[in-house]
Amino acid sequence: MGESPKGLRKGTWTTEEDILLRQCIDKYGEGKWHRVPLRTGLNRCRKSCRLRWLNYLKPSIKRGKLCSDEVDLVLRLHKLLGNRWSLIAGRLPGRTANDVKNYWNTHLSKKHDERCCKTKMINKNITSHPTSSAQKIDVLKPRPRSFSDKNSCNDVNILPKVDVVPLHLGLNNNYVCESSITCNKDEQKDKLININLLDGDNMWWESLLEADVLGPEATETAKGVTLPLDFEQIWARFDEETLELN
């Protein structure tokens, strides 16, 4: 088992054998290698005929050194596939597995071993000195906005100014005190807002200004009611109410 048949020729091929093998494949095509020795009369085994054709006699085979792109591709494929030369050669058109293997062993194996040694040394240095290349990084943290004492005092002391309209300009039966309020704010400077002040503490003015207190001196006009005021009577009435409250 496993022994070659007796009388088969081994070793290098002659030019006559190459011509016979080429003529047979041109006539019958590739494949059916067990019939090639019978058709050609060669004293060779089918495996020897197949390898001779695929590695040397096939017209599409490229000869010469590998270019830079092919070398780069061989390095990448060898890193993935290892020593599977037939698979690597299948990715290189026109290159045989034997050519790729020979080129690797003669040119690339030493370089590959040197690169592996360098990477191992670098990894050892990194693991032995992990903190040697560490750098300090300054972190800037946000700070809260601070206000000066002057600004805080100015903000507290800002109050709206109220201008009260005199009594003789705004009195009628239904007393309404109109005033203008000016707000000194940054966004609403120099703007007047007219509002109606209805304060419960000032409602006692209505009782002082009614017609039954002032008597028949009130005269009606087309615009409204005008009241001649007697301030002495008003203040006397005010004193009486304060005494009653006390």
UniProtKB/Swiss-Prot annotation:
Name the UniProt record assigns to this protein: Transcription factor MYB113
Function noted in UniProt: Transcription activator, when associated with BHLH002/EGL3/MYC146, BHLH012/MYC1, or BHLH042/TT8.
Pfam families: Myb_DNA-binding
CDD domains: SANT
GO molecular function: DNA binding; DNA-binding transcription factor activity
Binding region for DNA: 33-57, 85-108
Domain HTH myb-type: 5-61, 62-112
Subunit field text: Interacts with BHLH002/EGL3/MYC146, BHLH012/MYC1 and BHLH042/TT8.
GO BP terms: regulation of anthocyanin biosynthetic process; regulation of DNA-templated transcription
Subcellular localization, as worded in the UniProt entry: Nucleus
Stored SMART domains: SANT
Domain of life: Eukaryota
PANTHER family the UniProt entry points to: TRANSCRIPTION FACTOR MYB113-RELATED, TRANSCRIPTION FACTOR MYB8-RELATED-RELATED
Record organism: Arabidopsis thaliana (Mouse-ear cress)
Keywords: Activator, Developmental protein, DNA-binding, Nucleus, Repeat, Transcription, Transcription regulation
A Gene Ontology term for the protein's cellular component: nucleus
